[in-house]
Structure formats: structure tokens, C-alpha cells
Amino acid sequence: MPEAKPAAKKAPKGKDAPKGAPKEAPPKEAPAEAPKEAPPEDQSPTAEEPTGVFLKKPDSVSVETGKDAVVVAKVNGKELPDKPTIKWFKGKWLELGSKSGARFSFKESHNSASNVYTVELHIGKVVLGDRGYYRLEVKAKDTCDSCGFNIDVEAPRQDASGQSLESFKRTSEKKSDTAGELDFSGLLKKREVVEEEKKKKKKDDDDLGIPPEIWELLKGAKKSEYEKIAFQYGITDLRGMLKRLKKAKVEVKKSAAFTKKLDPAYQVDRGNKIKLMVEISDPDLTLKWFKNGQEIKPSSKYVFENVGKKRILTINKCTLADDAAYEVAVKDEKCFTELFVKEPPVLIVTPLEDQQVFVGDRVEMAVEVSEEGAQVMWMKDGVELTREDSFKARYRFKKDGKRHILIFSDVVQEDRGRYQVITNGGQCEAELIVEEKQLEVLQDIADLTVKASEQAVFKCEVSDEKVTGKWYKNGVEVRPSKRITISHVGRFHKLVIDDVRPEDEGDYTFVPDGYALSLSAKLNFLEIKVEYVPKQEPPKIHLDCSGKTSENAIVVVAGNKLRLDVSITGEPPPVATWLKGDEVFTTTEGRTRIEKRVDCSSFVIESAQREDEGRYTIKVTNPVGEDVASIFLQVVDVPDPPEAVRITSVGEDWAILVWEPPMYDGGKPVTGYLVERKKKGSQRWMKLNFEVFTETTYESTKMIEGILYEMRVFAVNAIGVSQPSMNTKPFMPIAPTSEPLHLIVEDVTDTTTTLKWRPPNRIGAGGIDGYLVEYCLEGSEEWVPANTEPVERCGFTVKNLPTGARILFRVVGVNIAGRSEPATLAQPVTIREIAEPPKIRLPRHLRQTYIRKVGEQLNLVVPFQGKPRPQVVWTKGGAPLDTSRVHVRTSDFDTVFFVRQAARSDSGEYELSVQIENMKDTATIRIRVVEKAGPPINVMVKEVWGTNALVEWQAPKDDGNSEIMGYFVQKADKKTMEWFNVYERNRHTSCTVSDLIVGNEYYFRVYTENICGLSDSPGVSKNTARILKTGITFKPFEYKEHDFRMAPKFLTPLIDRVVVAGYSAALNCAVRGHPKPKVVWMKNKMEIREDPKFLITNYQGVLTLNIRRPSPFDAGTYTCRAVNELGEALAECKLEVRVPQ
């Protein structure tokens, strides 16, 4: 049984330190530290290498009863692959948690800068039961480490008179040690009270701080259950507990009502059902069930069952409310138990999704878990989000059934990052990207052509109502005046010019504040003039597109409006005709139309398209002549989507995306690409780059291993962004495992080498399919695979190697992501058998004589060691074995000696020799095959005296090849010949049979007993033992006759009676006397003679007077008198007759 060790005692600071000086109590904030101790003997180091994850191990502490204890430890997060799981234990296996009580609290914090985890254990108001050995365990994936410490609980400090120092108080409420006056009222107690407290304290020390109900449970439990109960209730001082129980010497009372009680505790998962069963001694006893002292009534949740003497309570669909104490009551007896309802692990049903939002948007990050009302922890960039900080950070939590939502009402740039949700059964994470809000133009400004004194209205609409802006005319800001009005209503911005004048003509621009955006339109002033030109003038086209090129060219963006205003002159006014190639345009309405004015011809395209690109010709004619001009219209557009988008390689949290440039660049060279990513099944795309990426290969990072993703690409040119490409096939970031660990050589022969290793430290979501082993000759760089298919176990034997060569070996892990980094031996291995001297490992049961019965199998397995394979030889008495009876099979590690049916001839000494060249080892095995012995011989009755007989015999001729253990003697009467046992396992060849019956004649028989049992047949005595009768004188006893005479005596007197008139009545009494007395019945002192109303009977001294249908006249005093020669006796009673009303 393990024993908890107390904390080490502190050494005194100096030699002169007084022995009785009180120890200073450690402050609450900094518990006293004790020297570090070696771990207990039962905490032996494991075979694994130490991980060294503790920067500061918990120290053993010593604390006074009633004080608080604090234990602190620090864990190095750099040594851990993931966030660690922290567990505290008392003793070896008792885990401290929410069930441990409110006195135990746990705290955990993480410093992200240094990656150090600080964990604390707080125990409030410690009691004596808290002392003992504790253990801290840290686990993260495959990494596990633990360390132990002790908590020693001391009694409160006292002064020299035995008074507790806490009795001295100060009247002031200040925290200073010298403030106020000392108050000694706490010491004004009677001496008897102090003595009682000392006795109570001593009793508490004897009880080891264990509650009385636990002592009662231990007293009624079996010794084999002590350790189980101790671990269940956190008792670590097992030796003290056993001593206390031994002193108690309590006689366990057997329950009169229960034959089987409830177990001390039960555990069930929430939502499941559980059955509590007791067995009572009497099936007719009434039984009641109670929960926390309240009686349980039958319902659909609580079902009662009676099966024979068993009484079963079934609790259906257990909830946390069913976590309580239960008891069963039968009469005055009760038995108790406690039910613990265990919360199932909370799983992530719908994980978080990546989101990309703008500043000021409302954001809801939702996750759905498997249990309603479950506790989840939100974290941002590794830091926990709490409700206390929610007021400062502008976020709040919301629960909607199984959905947990983190809400940002007005998101800002500081809220971006990676958010994580952690439950006790899983976790998920997502990234929140916050961008500056982009302004969207909902309605652009249109060009205006107005006449004099008319009103011009420029109007635009943007996506943000709060955005303000300024108006400009030809680059000069427009100021409001009597004619000019500027308004801003919601998303609409207006510029109104009343009474338009020629100087109002120009380019008007609206520029929103804070955005690199401008909206422009042109105001054309239409002036009507009537002039008379008496002369004729040939037509002339006034066209100038660039002024610098010989060829007129115009560039328009697809989707935009194009308006070509061409001024023409001539008299009379010429007629303008527009052509595209040979096609003539004549329409004045529609998307493409012609507008005509006096001195201008306009060609309008409402929404330019790619097919509108080409050379346009305008021809003007009048009677005087004609003029022709051509314009090349180039329509530019956003490019087509990129092509052949695919994933070429993936890693643990990254993937390589490759694509081809678009077939059509939109008339402008492609300046770069934009990449987006999303989780499969999600609708939210997340931008990966905000600046255009010029290459066609992109590496995406910060991905979650084991999650399916999709990606797409946009092409960008000077015009804008293309449509998205086709989504890539779903892919999953998976990395190869890390290299295998601890590669060693286990065995080497002339042609083989056996390697062993341990699994990789990091396996990842892709798992591991197996391992590949490769070898390379020293001096060569070519690695030869030793196995084509991966092996699953962490060991492999490489065969067919050249003898004497020096070879280097390496092992790689393989999974769906590919090969891991290799684990290579530090030094080459020489392929040569390592000679090992032979050694026979004779089993313990073969080191002494091996005994078997005739007919049984002889199957001996003898292991040995030695390299190369030794030569094994079996002999018996120096001669070879008879192969017709004995079969021998030898392997590299053992030899088997087998006989199917053993015979006595197989007994003897066998020699086993194991030899390698000139080295040899031998062993001797002694085998004895036994059977039943023969019967004893010459069984004779040697002497008879009194009721005794002496029987002798000789040992059997065949002892069955085994030592005779004794003889079995029986006797039989010659008359009945029924055999009765006299002696069992009598070791001598003679015995004296006593207590034989006089006058009988006896036979005797004897069996021989050895290790196989009694002999099949007995040895029967040839003569008999006759027990003769001896002479006896009979003296009769003297007979004295007894005098049976006695005077009459009433054994049962008469009793007073009250009867109802008309119903027969009887008066009874009993009398004894010898000779038989004469009986006389009287009424009111008058003898009752032969009256038919009365019937007198006498049966064996029982006297009865029957009165037929009595009337009130029959009431009175009745007397019975009994008389014989020795005397008389009287008995009387009163009879009352009542008439019914």
C-alpha cells in the first residue's frame, strides 16, 4: 500500500535557537516554502526521456490549520506542441476538480511574449485531511510530464501557556500591527472549556481529519476495500488510518434488513439512465427511497422495480439535478450512496467561419456546439476574451440554444485577428479581417446641355450617407450663391445652377472627402443665334482627338457612355453621315444613336461594349462640297478570369497556388492578380492580398491543418478587376510527419540488421501510413530502399546485406502528404554476427525434480541464448534419446522436449547441452513419472485385548515410483460387511483399532496412498478380530411406590359472567384430586338437582354448567363444590342476565 511522505522539516537557523520558540506563520500571499524533496518511491521515473517542461516546479509547503495554501508552478510553452492540459491530483489517482469542493480553486495564465504558462492551486482554510502527497500533471498531445510535492498541515501556533496566539486581538480596525489596544477577552474562558477543547483537538488529531461518516464506512467495509475507499475520499495517510481502525476494534454488526447494500458511489453520463439496487432479507418489508432527504415518488423519471428480494430504482435521462445523495430506509436501518452525473464532452458541430468586413460593420461570429448550455471559452490571438473586458473592447457574448455568438456592433481595425473557441471536447478557429470601408458610387453625374436662363442640376448618389464632399468647376471649388445651390440629403449630393449663363459652361467635378474618388460631368451651354450669311461655304469637319497623333483615336472603357461631338461648318448647313466600315448609322434612338444640331453632329454609345471597337467615319456634304474624317474607337475592358487555377503542393498550414494568365487582357496589360480563399461549404471568401500580385504562383499561409479549402484568382488591369476564376478543387493542408525518434540498432547478424525506433513527435491531421527503411554503403551516396511497402510497426529487419560491409541506415515516415525528414544513424553499422556465449535459462520449476503422472504429456520448454545459433543436444544417461517416444524441437531461442504419453520408463536424468564452437553450457533435468502404488501385503490382526485390536502389514511391492504418504485403514463387521474409516494417512505399517463392539467379529483392510492417490485395491486381513463378552452381575434397583392421593384443588376458578337473555351460556372450571372428588353445583347456596334447564358435565376434571336460554330469573351466585376423603374445595362466580332493549 503506498504511503504518503510528509514534507521535510526545516533545519534551525542557528544552534542557539530555542526549542520552544514558535514558528512564524507564512503570509497568505506567499506560503512558506520547504526544501525540495525527491519524489516518493512509488513515483519512479519512467523509461521515457524527461521532457523538462517545468521552468518552476511546485514546492512543498507547510501551513497552519485554517490558513490558505497556494502552490505555484511555471510551464515552458516552447517545449509543448500545443496548449497544455493541466491536472492536479491528490495522492496517485484522486483528481482535483469541480467535485473537490469550493475550498479548491485553480488558476491558469499565459504570457504570450515569453510563452510561459503559470498555474496555481489555491486551498482555502486547510484541514488536517488536506495534508499528504500531491501531483501536478502537464499533458499536450504526445508530451506528458508530472512532478510531485507535499502539503504539511500544522496545528495553530500557541504561546508558552498553551493559548492560541489568535486570541489576542486589537480594538482598532486599522491593519497596522501596533494600532489600537490589546483585547484579552478571548482568554477569559473557564479552564474546563480549555480542557474540553484540548481533548477535542486530540480527538481530531486521532481522527486524522477524516469525517465521522467516513470512519463509519471504513468500520463496516472489508479490509480489501480500505485502499479503494481511501483513494475515493482522498485519504493519503493510509498507515495512520489502519492504526486508527486497529485501535477501534469495532465489531461489525450484520444488517438485519439488508443482505446487499448500495455501493458508496455511482457515476453516470448526463442523458443516460442508471439503476440503484439493494437486496433485503425479507421481501415483505416496506422500503422507501430518498433524494437529499426528500422521499422519491414513482414517476416516468423514477421507476421502482421489485424482483424477488431485490429492490431497484431506475433514474431515466439523468441531468445535473440528479447529482445528489440517495438513501434507502427499511424500518430503522438505512444505507446511503452518492450519484455523480458526468458532463459529456462538448463537441463543435458548426465551426467558426473566416470573415472579411469593413470598419463600422456589425459582425457576428457564431459557433454551434453539441450540448445546450455548455461552457465555451473565446480567445483572440491566444488571449482569453472575458465578460469583464467586453465593455472596453466593444463586444458582447450571446447564447441561443446550442449556438454561441460573439457580436461586434461597430467593428474597428483593432478587432482583426484569429479567434478561437475552445470546449472540453474540441476547438475551432477563424480569422477576422477588417478593411477600411470603400465608397461605392450608386449614381454618377450625367452631362448636361442647357439653354440660356434654364436650370442645370448635377446629381449623384454614393453608398455612405455620412460622406461629405466638394464641387469643382474646371478645378476651382464652387461656392454657393444666389444662383448656385449645394445640397446633401442622405446619400444624394446636388449642385443646382439657376439662370444658366454662357460663363457657366465647363467641367464640373464632385470629390468625396477622405476618398481618392471623383465624379465628373460637362455642362454644355446651347446658344441660339440667327445669322444671315449671304455667301456659300464648303463643309468642314473640325475634329481633334489628341492633337499629337496623325491618326484620330479614342479610348473608352467598356460599360461607359461615349459621346462624340464633332463641330461642322458650311453654308448651306451640311448633312452629316456616320459609318462603321461600310455600315451606315441612321438611328436616332437606342444604345447607339446619332444626334444632330445646327453646327454639331454627335455619335452616342450609351454603354460601350467590346464589339463596338473599330474605325468610324463621319462624312458631311452640302451643295458646295463634302468633307470626310475617320476616328478609331478602342474599347478597353477588365480582363478575362485567369485560367488553369490549381494547387500544386500543400504543407502543414500552407499551399502553393498556380494559374495561367487570362486569354484576353481587356485591351490593357494585366498589372497583377488578387487571390481569395474560403473553407469548403462556407460562403465567405477572404482576400489574401490587398496589393496586386504580379506573379502566377502564390503561397497561401496561416491555414488550419485538416480543413478543406477552396481558392480563386482575379486578374487586374488598368480598367478594373476581372470576374473570379473557377474554384480550385477542394484541398486540405497536410504536412508530412516529423522525423522518427530514437533510431537504434537492436540486433545484427551476418546478413541482417534489426532496427527499432519510436513514432514521430508530430504526426498531424494526415496521420501516418507507415515507415520506409533505406540503407547506404559507406562512401556511397545512393540510398537503397529496404522495403517497398510502408511498415506500420516501429521496427524492421533488413535482410540480404553483404557480410562485413559498413552500412548507414535511415528511416522516414510516410503519409498522404509525402515523406518526412529522415532519421539517420549517427555511425555506420558493420554487418557481422556479434558472438554471444551460450547460456541456458532453466525455468524455476525445472531446477527441481519434475513430477508427472503416467499417461500425461511431458512438454518442457527451455529457453537459451547465444549467437550465432548454438547447437542443442539432449541425452539421457549419456545416451541419445529414443526418437520414437521423445520429440525435440529447437528454435533460435528455445528448445522443446515433448512426450505425448509419459511412461515410468521416461523417468531419469536428462542432460541438455548448448554449444557454440568451443563455448558450451549444460543443464541437468530430473524427471519422475509416477502412478498409484500397489496394495499393502500380509495384513494381519496380531493381537486383540478388550475392545482393541492391533493390525500390522507390510509395505507394497510397487510404490508407484513415488514416496508413500501413508495408509488408509478401514474396518467392517462380519455380519454386515459395511466398511468404516478408522485411520487416514497413517504413516506406520501398524495401527491399533479401539472402541470395537463387544461380541462382534471384525475384518480390516488397508489402502496405500502416494502423490497419485489411493491404491486401486486394498490389502485385506486374513484373520479376524473377535471381541469376546465378559461376565456381568445385574443388581436390580429398589422400587418405592408413589402416593398419588391429594385433596381437591381448583386449577381454573369460575369467573363472573354477563350474558344476554335468550342465549345459552356456560360456566367452566377445572378441578384436580385423588381419589376422584364428588362435584356439586349450587345456585344461591341451593343445590341444583335434576333440572332440564341445566346440563352438568365432567370431562377429565374439566367441569361445565350449561344454562339453556337464561332469563333474568337465572341471575345470581353460582358455586361449585368438590369433595373427597381428603378434603373439599369451593369455587363461585356471579352471573348477570341482561334483557336486550
UniProtKB/Swiss-Prot annotation:
**Stretch list, region Disordered:** 1-62
Ranges for the Fibronectin type-III domain? 641-737, 739-834, 935-1030
Question: Key word Transmembrane helix present in the record?
Answer: no
Domain Ig-like C2-type per the UniProt entry, residue ranges: 50-153, 255-344, 345-437, 438-538, 539-638, 838-932, 1048-1141
Keyword annotations of the record: Actin-binding, Cell adhesion, Immunoglobulin domain, Muscle protein, Repeat, Thick filament
Q: Where is the composition biased (Basic and acidic residues)?
A: 13-39
Domain of life here? Eukaryota
Q: Which InterPro entries match?
A: FN3_dom, FN3_sf, Ig-like_dom, Ig-like_dom_sf, Ig-like_fold, Ig_I-set, Ig_sub, Ig_sub2
| Gene Ontology MF term list | actin binding; structural constituent of muscle
Described by its record, this protein's role is as follows:
Thick filament-associated protein located in the crossbridge region of vertebrate striated muscle a bands. In vitro it binds MHC, F-actin and native thin filaments, and modifies the activity of actin-activated myosin ATPase. It may modulate muscle contraction or may play a more structural role.
Q: What is this protein called?
A: Myosin-binding protein C, fast-type
Q: What species was this sequence derived from? A: Homo sapiens (Human)
What phylogenetic lineage does the species belong to?
Eukaryota, Metazoa, Chordata, Craniata, Vertebrata
The encoding gene:
MYBPC2
